[in-house]
């Protein structure tokens, strides 16, 4: 019977911190300019209309509006559809 734990058990017990990746704002949600839409490693989602891409591939809103997910040329894209405010009707 061993009186020491052995190399394996004492070498285990480490884990990296979670990176909190994923979609942060979903389709139809209203966002302001600068809000983060998707945190990702690589380009699972590509930037579309009114969406910018950061150095770590984070997608963020360039303008205020509603989030819209779409497919373009077999790529998943994220767009921001600007809010078009209707003018009051003139009588």
UniProtKB/Swiss-Prot annotation:
The keyword Ribonucleoprotein applies. It holds the Pfam family Ribosomal_L27. One of its GO terms (cellular component) is cytosolic large ribosomal subunit. Residues 1-25 are annotated as: Disordered. Keywords: Ribonucleoprotein, Ribosomal protein. One of its GO terms (biological process) is translation. One of its GO terms (molecular function) is structural constituent of ribosome. It comes from the Bacteria. HAMAP family: Ribosomal_bL27. Belongs to the bacterial ribosomal protein bL27 family. This is Large ribosomal subunit protein bL27. The gene is rpmA.
């Amino acid at each position: 019977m061993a009186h020491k734990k052995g190399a394996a058990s004492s070498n285990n017990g480490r884990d990296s911190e979670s990176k909190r990746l994923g979609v942060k704002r979903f389709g139809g949600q209203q966002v302001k300019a600068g809000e983060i839409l998707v945190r990702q490693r690589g380009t699972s989602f590509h930037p579309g209309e009114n969406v910018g891409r950061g150095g770590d591939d984070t997608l963020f809103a360039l303008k205020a509006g509603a989030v819209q997910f779409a497919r373009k040329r077999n790529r998943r894209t994220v767009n921001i559809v600007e809010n078009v405010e209707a003018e009051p009707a003139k009588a």
